[in-house]
A protein has these predicted regions:
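Positively charged n-region of N-terminal signal peptides that target proteins for export
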Residues: 1-4
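Sec-dependent N-terminal signal peptides
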Residues: 6-10
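Alpha/beta-hydrolase superfamily serine-hydrolase fold, recognizing
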Residues: 12-291
Length: 291
């Protein structure tokens, strides 16, 4: 029970202290603002390695949200350090090129690939071997986590054993997205096309689907936790339903956790669902990482 509480408090810190900074955490070796690319200042990550005798470790990677145009890795600082301290897992939180730099989903996925390669190398330089990793993302970060994991099966620098999506977009052609007219140009920019509106988005379906995790579902994708609120007015609940159904049909494993009445924030609004989510993360991490 104590570890469940610790895991809960570590992740909930994201929502309570978005910009909290604290001194070095005992038992954690911290590496801040490591450049994993040379194209943009955005290509930086923070890495936390556990100070433990057994250097064979699991890794949890956090990808921040912010509508692909805002947000920062430091939002996950306390969450990442808490997991490394309490569970002995390596953790990383990364920034990536966003829409303001004219990046599309292609560049964003390239950044995740580069970041994982860099993390593996940095860990090895310090005597660690990363067994596998879990990807955890919220909103836009959840979309990128899913899209990366599904699209790149067979080419991970570090094996991806699971993905956790908190309110993540999964199908950019879902009509329910376009009830909010402001979302259309944003999704178009993400997919690399201009002129997308709530009235004409169907004409861009091919491009939008290329940027949608639902397009890359197969029996080989990592097991996935989908968490979504039924009252989400930014990313429609139907997006999670669509992906869950597609994964089930393909023979992929999907744990779909519904947060009744929750909006886009998801966690903390449904205690029973939150507990189920945290327990699932703990179980999967222990099983996949071996401790």
């Amino acid at each position: 029970m104590q570890k469940i509480i610790a895991f809960f408090m570590s992740i909930i810190a994201f929502f309570m202290n978005l910009f909290g900074l604290t001194p070095k955490t005992p038992g954690v070796t911290e590496y801040k603002d490591l450049a994993y690319g040379s194209v943009s200042e955005s290509q930086k990550l923070d890495l936390y390695l556990p100070e433990r005798e057994d250097k064979n470790v699991g890794l949890i990677v956090y990808i921040h949200g912010g509508a692909w145009q805002s947000g920062d890795k430091k939002e996950l600082t306390e969450t990442a350090k808490g997991i490394t301290r309490d569970f002995g897992y390596a953790t990383a939180s990364l920034n990536y090129r966003m829409l303001g730099e004219k990046a599309t989903y292609v560049e964003m996925l390239d950044d995740i690939q580069s970041a994982l390669s860099f993390i593996r190398q940095k860990a090895e330089e310090n005597g660690y071997k990363i067994k596998c990793c879990g990807l955890i993302g919220y909103s836009a970060g959840a979309h990128l986590s899913l899209l990366y994991a599904f699209k790149n099966v067979g080419s991970y620098p570090i094996p991806v054993s699971y993905v956790s999506s908190l309110a993540g977009p999964t199908d950019l052609t879902d009509p329910n997205f376009y009830k909010n007219e402001a979302i259309a140009p944003l999704l178009g920019s993400l997919a690399g096309v201009s002129g997308v509106t709530a009235e004409n988005y169907e004409g861009y379906a091919q491009e939008l689907l290329k940027a949608s995790p639902v397009s890359y579902v197969s029996a080989d994708v990592p097991k996935t936790i989908l968490c979504h609120g039924t009252a989400d007015d930014i990313v429609p609940y139907s997006n999670a339903q669509i992906l869950s159904e597609k994964m089930n049909s393909a023979g992929a494993f999907c744990k779909f956790i519904t947060f009744e009445g929750a909006n886009h924030g998801v966690l903390g609004e449904d205690t029973a669902s939150s507990e189920l989510y945290y327990n699932t993360l703990i179980e999967w991490s222990k099983t996949d990482f071996g401790y």
